[in-house]
Structures are given as structure tokens and as C-alpha cells.
Amino acid sequence: MLIKTSCNFVQRLALICLGIGMFTAALHAFAQATYPNKPVRFFVPFTAGSGTDIVARTVADVISKSLGQPVLIENRPGAGGTIAASQVAKSDPDGYTILVHSSGHALNPSIYPNLPYDTVKDLWGVTPIAALPNVLVVSPARGWKSVSDMLAATKAAPGQLNYASAGMGSATHLNAEKFKLQAGIEAVHVPFKGTPEALSDVIGGRNDWFFAPLSSALPLIKDGKLQALAVSTAQRSQALPQVPTTVEAGVSGSDYVFWVGMLVPSATPAPIVKRLHDEVIKALALAEVKDKLNRLGAEPMPMSPEAFNAFIKVEMDAAAKIAKAAGLKGS
């Protein structure tokens, strides 16, 4: 009797567990089928007005209309983007909390040894959104008309001039470090919370130079508040065709591309990842989005999730080499 009762109990327990499992699976399937049924949040790890923020906002409105739900931009600056990345990595993998990060995402593992998340295992790339140049800008008051002028002044006072970035480990920081290594110069790094703050200090003459996202710096260049010396990409920008590349300006191997991409927690269901990917690709194909990106000096950068995640690993390897050569360490 005892054995029979025990068997019945085990059978009932197994049926209960099976029922719970089926119910949970049904809930997940329902959630995916009805996605999205509430606002979606884009976590941007830099301040409003930064290059990453501008690109995120360019596609957010279009995606919001297509999804039928608000897409809210939440700026979470700090620690080179690792604060926002950590928050997204630890969020529910349901497609409602999304990271819109820059190429600095690939550098952070090399300079922050104790990240609270694994860049590859905890976050899954959906697609890059856009690639854009950084532009080397200085205050017109400096009197530097070319990269050669700036390099001459820097080499004449090694370690005395400074340069701004949008934060330790940001794409603007990595760009500057690569340029420094290739140019053979010494300068002091001054990190800020975001691009607008860094630009303000360069305009005010408190910082000597800055590789700023072209999307943020372009209006200030056109207004004469900043002098553009070179763009970071291998080819000139259509937005500033008269401005040479850093390679054309004489610093070989200094080209750098600032990309902005979308990532989600790695456990996010594949159908939701596909939906988000498809929405971005649709947005990038629209003439209005292409026009906005073009005016920012940016270009659409569509990729499949698989290609994007492979690309991130390649970028991590390249960033690690720069970080090691430059001796970069985060706090």
C-alpha cells in the first residue's frame, strides 16, 4: 500500500511539473506572439546629444510607429557604457529593454577587468544601425589649420596638451588612442560623461582636441565654433568633403569607424530578436531615415544577428591590441 501510494504521489508530482512546464511554455509563446504589448526602452549609455543617442533617436520614432508601441530613450551614461550594458544584460530577456551602444562596447572588456557581465555570453547583437565618422576638432582659437599643425604643437610639448572623450572606453576614446599610437604623440586623456560636455570644453579652450562623432559636431563646425582637421574613416565624409581623412593627413593606419548597434539579453527568444532585427532593417531602408543619417554623415550598416556577433568578436580583438599597446586601464 505504501509503495502504491508513493508511486501515485510521484506520478501526480510528475504530472504537475509537466503541467507547469507546458503552462510556462504557453505563456512564453503567447508573449512572443503578442510582442510588443507595452513600451519598449532603448538604453543609451551616453548623454543626450551624443552620437550614439542621435542615431538611436533617428530610428526610434520609425520603429515605434511600426511596432505600435512607444520607444522610450533612456540615457544611462557612465563607465564607458558599462553601466547601461550591465543593466540590459541583467534585465528580463523579453525584448522590452534594449541596449543601443557604440563600438566602445568592444573595448570595455579590455580595460575594465571586473565587468558585471560577459560581453559575448550575456548580450546578443541584433544588428548594427549605422557607421559614422569621428571628426578631429579643435577650437578655432588654437590657430591650427591642419593635422600637421596640431601634431607639431603636441610634439613640441609632450604630455602637456590634453584631449577629450565621451568617456573612458567610449568609441571616441578608442579612436583617440589609436590615433596617438599611430602618430607617436603624448597627450593627457580627459573623459567626460558624453559628447556634448566634451565639445563644450573644446569650444571653451579647456581641452585641446577631440575625436567627436560627426553627427554631434557638424552643426558646430558649420557655425564656426569648431575647426575640423580630419575625419577618422578611410574615405572622406560626404558631409564634409573638403576635410581630409587622418590617413590623408599623414597618419598612416589611423583610420577608425564609429558604429552604433542594437543588443539584447542573450536569452531573448529568437522570434523577438528577428522582429527587432527586421524592424531596424525596414527603418534603414526608408528614404527619410537614409536622409537623416546622410545629413549626420552616417551610413546604414545592416547585418544579420549572426554576422554582427561575429563582427563584435573581431572588434574586441582589435580593441584589445590597442588597449594593450596604449596601457589603458579603467577604474
Describe these PLM feature segments.
Residues 1-11:
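N-terminal secretory signal peptides that target proteins for export/translocation
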Residues 13-25:
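Bacterial N-terminal signal peptides
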Residues 25-31:
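Sec/Tat signal peptide C-region and signal peptidase I cleavage site
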Residues 31-121, 160-162, 184-211, 300-303, ...:
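N-terminal (or domain-start) structured segment
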Residues 90-96, 110-197, 209, 246-248, ...:
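Hinge/capping helix and adjacent helix->loop/strand transition within the periplasmic-binding protein
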Residues 105-114, 178-182, 209-243:
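A ligand-binding cleft/hinge motif common to bilobed small-molecule-binding domains
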